[in-house]
């Protein structure tokens, strides 16, 4: 699913990493915990499960997590990562919130 940087441009690769981390690690973790925030340990446990199941390098997912913070989909405060407040209704409904929906909600003023 994830390609090396040489196969795609820098921006396409970053977007793909963000999409993967959001869809496979972060959003399922949020729904599993039924909470707007998670710790680094919780993220790492979920990431390790997904990476071993899908045979993905952990480095790809760490870049995706940082990228989600840069896009302000995830916010980091001390040792907690939390989702943007506009995504909380999706969590409460246990709705599917793909990356496109998340980025759209965050960018709405």
Tell me what each language-model feature is.
Residues 1-37:
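Short alpha-helical segments that sit at the start of domains
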Residues 52-56, 90-92:
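Short acidic, glycine/proline-enriched loop segments that cap or flank alpha-helices
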Residues 54-70:
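Short amphipathic alpha-helical interaction segments
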Residues 69-79:
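A short, conserved structural fragment
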Residues 79-86:
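Minor-groove-contacting beta-hairpin "wing" of winged helix-turn-helix DNA-binding domains
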Residues 35-49:
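Short acidic, hydrophobic short linear motifs in intrinsically disordered regions
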Residues 87-109:
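Short, amphipathic alpha-helical interaction segments positioned at domain boundaries
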